[in-house]
């Protein structure tokens, strides 16, 4: 999909990640979370028992964005949304959220839950999601619980 903004045009292909992508995805997620947000890399892994599924955005042969979906306490969740700094402002995060949500709904989920930073909450609201509680501080930034429901999804 082509993404345009005030920056130069970029073609980012959003797709389900494969095993060969995981090293680059985990490096990107670690860099964004630790270096930009101060969240230790040790908090990034999703336990295998949560059956994580990863998607990535690829541009010019490299991974520039990623997002995971996983099952926790019997419900679908999304998280670990990361876009490289140089590629922000091109709607890659929105594309990832739309693609991941559509796939999880296709797998039978009725709701997808998340605890998200303000910018992600704005994306989720545009896609028909809603805030479900009060924000909490996590490493100095607000995390707000939100849900995206199949019947309200505008993707």
Model-derived regions, located:
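Short amphipathic alpha-helix that is part of the acyltransferase structural core
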Residues: 2-41, 54-58, 150-155
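Short loop/turn motifs at secondary-structure junctions and domain boundaries
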Residues: 45-51
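Conserved beta-strand in the GNAT
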Residues: 56, 62-70, 77-82
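A conserved beta-turn-beta hairpin within the catalytic core of GNAT-like acetyltransferases
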Residues: 71-81, 88, 138-140
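Conserved acetyl-CoA-binding loop-helix of GNAT-fold acetyltransferases
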Residues: 83, 89-102
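Conserved GNAT acetyl-CoA-binding A-motif
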Residues: 104-117
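Conserved catalytic-core motifs of GNAT/GCN5-like acyltransferases
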Residues: 113-115, 130-148
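Conserved active-site tyrosine of GNAT-family acetyltransferases
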Residues: 124-125, 129
């Amino acid at each position: 999909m082509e993404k345009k903004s005030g920056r130069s045009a970029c073609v980012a292909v959003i797709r389900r990640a494969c095993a060969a992508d995981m090293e680059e995805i985990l490096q990107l997620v670690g860099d964004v979370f630790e270096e930009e947000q101060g969240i230790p890399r040790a908090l990034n892994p999703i336990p295998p028992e949560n059956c994580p599924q990863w998607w990535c955005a690829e541009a010019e042969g490299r991974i520039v964005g990623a997002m995971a979906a996983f099952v926790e306490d019997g419900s679908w969740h999304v998280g670990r949304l990361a876009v490289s700094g140089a590629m922000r402002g091109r709607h890659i995060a929105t594309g990832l959220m739309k693609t991941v949500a559509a796939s999880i709904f296709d797998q039978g989920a009725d709701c997808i839950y998340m605890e998200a930073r303000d910018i992600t909450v704005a994306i989720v609201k545009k896609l028909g999601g809603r805030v479900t509680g009060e924000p909490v501080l996590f490493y100095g930034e607000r995390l707000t619980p939100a849900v995206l429901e199949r019947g309200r999804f505008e993707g």
